């Protein structure tokens, strides 16, 4: 099944009932909503009040349509100076966020500070190959306010996790069809943020819920992920401090 929105694989999180899960830069709550079917405690942090309002609305809507077993708390804020004590969470997620912030190291240290020892951290950032193409084809892609401020090399993002106390144990490459959509927008559309006919068609193809079960789309996405994924997703386990 194709799901262009879900970077995180719940199976790799090994969720236990009552686990506390933090999503920093949660946006409109795509991963929080996916995890709401589990009996866990979810916390979302984002700078945008509007996005958090949309998250809460979608959470209530989801609860009316299917079983929701999670609790949800939403907090306005950024990744630096998180308002939680050390080791407050069993799992921490931060997807498509680090590439936007000036001091990614400070944010990553905060993510690991609030994560319990042996807890799992999930990070996703744009993959270097698709990102380099987008930067080359369109200056608008990286010059838009609030846009991406860096390109991560694959080895670099792994090293960033290790240097800050998390040992990667799994990596996935995802959402190659999103690379196609962004390339179309960057090279064909005249107005940035105003998708043209081709880009609108691609968005319709990828966004329509009934299309998620189209095997051909899932096959094309999986094939494309070998060459031009949009995102790299890393799972790391927080290293326990050495015993003294």
Regions found by a protein language model. Name each.
Residues 105-120:
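A short glycine-rich, Lys/Arg-flanked "PGG" loop and its adjoining helix->strand segment in the class I
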Residues 124-126, 174:
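Alpha/beta-hydrolase-fold catalytic nucleophile elbow
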Residues 42, 121-122:
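A short hydrophobic/small-residue beta-strand
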Residues 95-98, 124:
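Residues lining the SAM
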Residues 126-150, 158-159:
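Short, glycine-/aromatic-enriched active-site segment of Class I SAM-dependent methyltransferases
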Residues 155-172:
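A SAM-dependent methyltransferase catalytic signature shared across enzymes that methylate proteins
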Residues 1-85, 91-95, 105-108, 199-205, ...:
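Conserved N-terminal segment of class I S-adenosyl-L-methionine
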Residues 170-204, 230-231:
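Conserved catalytic loop of SAM-dependent methyltransferase domains
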């Amino acid at each position: 099944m194709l799901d262009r929105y879900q970077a995180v694989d719940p199976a790799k999180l090994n969720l236990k009932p009552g686990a506390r899960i933090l999503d920093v830069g949660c946006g409109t709550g795509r991963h929080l909503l996916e995890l709401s079917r589990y009996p866990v405690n979810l916390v979302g942090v984002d700078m945008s009040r509007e996005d958090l309002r949309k998250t809460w609305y979608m959470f209530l809507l989801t609860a009316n349509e299917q079983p929701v077993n999670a609790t949800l708390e939403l907090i306005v804020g950024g990744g630096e100076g998180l308002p939680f004590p050390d080791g407050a969470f069993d799992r921490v997620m931060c997807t498509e966020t680090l590439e936007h912030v000036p001091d990614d190291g400070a944010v990553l240290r905060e993510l690991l500070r609030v994560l319990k020892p042996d807890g799992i951290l999930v990070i996703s950032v744009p993959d270097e190959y698709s990102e380099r193409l987008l930067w080359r084809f369109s200056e608008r892609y990286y010059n838009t306010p609030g846009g991406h401020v860096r390109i991560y090399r694959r080895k670099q993002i792994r090293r960033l996790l290790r240097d800050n106390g998390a040992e990667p144990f799994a990596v996935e490459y995802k959402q190659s069809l999103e690379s196609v959509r962004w390339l179309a927008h960057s090279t064909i559309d005249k107005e940035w943020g105003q998708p043209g006919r081709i880009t609108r068609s691609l968005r319709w193809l990828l966004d329509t819920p009934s299309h998620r079960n189209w095997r051909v789309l899932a096959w094309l996405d999986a094939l494309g992920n070998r060459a031009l994924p949009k995102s790299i997703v890393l799972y790391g386990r927080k290293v326990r401090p050495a015993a003294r």
